[in-house]
Amino acid sequence: MKWCRFQSGRNVAYGVIDGTTVTEVTGSPFESHSKTANTSMLSRVKLLVPVIPPTFYAAGVNYREHVTEMAHRRGVKPEFPPNADVGYRANNALVATDEPIVIPKDAGELVQYEGELVAVIGKRCKKVSEAEALDYVFGSTLGNDDSERTWQRNDRTFWRGKNTDTFKAMGPWIVTGLNPDDL
């Protein structure tokens, strides 16, 4: 199933996409909901960020090719961490797929992007075992993780380099029922 958040006129709602049609739902995908009689052509609505989470996290340094690439750029030997480097991200950085990513005037020349697979968590959880983890995933969407590398190097944290407005494009929709082993 494909879920979206969309705007039609002044109305913002969640919807279910079927082919080229969006059916509005009451509630949200994460709580009780039901389809309404309101349908629109997908081409006639504005797709928004599919979900605005109160908090979200990013797992960095989580694949060998990226670690090797970054080490090569710095002229050092790659060091592979035992676990991903998880960092908090701010929802002010979220922007819909078709919206522009705005590079701040004071940014350096090292603004880079990385395509990401985003796991959308559908139920509140904490300290979940690896075996249970997928039970909490509602679905998947796409993300674009922009980073201002000069700020990352020079600031004491990654906050500004990773959380600048519009630096986290996400969407256009959430797909449920995907098997991560098949991606």
Each model region followed by its residue ranges:
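Active-site microenvironments in enzyme catalytic cores
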Residues: 4-183
